[in-house]
Amino acid sequence: SRSRGLGDVYKRQDHSTWAVLPHKFEAGTPAIGEAVGMGAAIRYLQMVGLEAIQAWEAQLTRHLFARLQAIDGVRVLGPTPDQQPERGALATFLVDGVHANDIAALIDASGICIRSGHHCCQPLHRIYDVTASARASLSFTSTFEEIDRFSEELASTVAFLREHS
């Protein structure tokens, strides 16, 4: 019998045809666009050069640490770039007397995105006896000017919170 309303794609099924392993367990459309995008990203990284990326991120990280350490009441967690040159291009930090979520929200209002919370490292937070931290992450596309703007906003935010608490 004919259905009324929206168009039909499926009437009934008499049998099933299964693909061979491993394809029979893969549902839906393969991630073709994602694979093409991944290939383009890999070619771009190869063009820029992984050593150049690592060197640039190391410079940025040293600059970020210097700027954060210059702000009164900011404590950077973990080893400095001088202590661990191969460290990631990020800085996790605390601001005395201010919850990390408040710092992140206020910094966000100025158009700068940082992370706050546990960062999936609750055991480390227990060691430092803190409930949350803030984290500024860098990329090889980051600039010294962006770090300067972030650190100026952070210093301004810390001063504002001290003045109003």
Regions found by a protein language model. Give the residues of each.
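Short, conserved charged micro-motifs
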Residues: 98-104, 145-148
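Well-ordered alpha-helical segments within folded domains of soluble proteins
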Residues: 33-43, 91
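PLP-dependent enzyme catalytic core of the Aspartate aminotransferase-like
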Residues: 39, 109-115, 121-165
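Short, solvent-exposed beta-strand edge segments and adjacent coil->beta transition regions
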Residues: 22, 86-90, 131-135
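Conserved small-domain helix->loop->beta segment predominantly found in fold-type I
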Residues: 26, 45-99, 162
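A short glycine-threonine-serine/GTX helix/turn-capping micro-motif
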Residues: 12, 16-32
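Single conserved hydrophobic/aromatic residue that forms the stacking wall/gate
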Residues: 1-6, 10
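Conserved N-terminal phosphate-binding loop of PLP-dependent enzymes in the Aspartate aminotransferase
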Residues: 18, 37, 89, 107
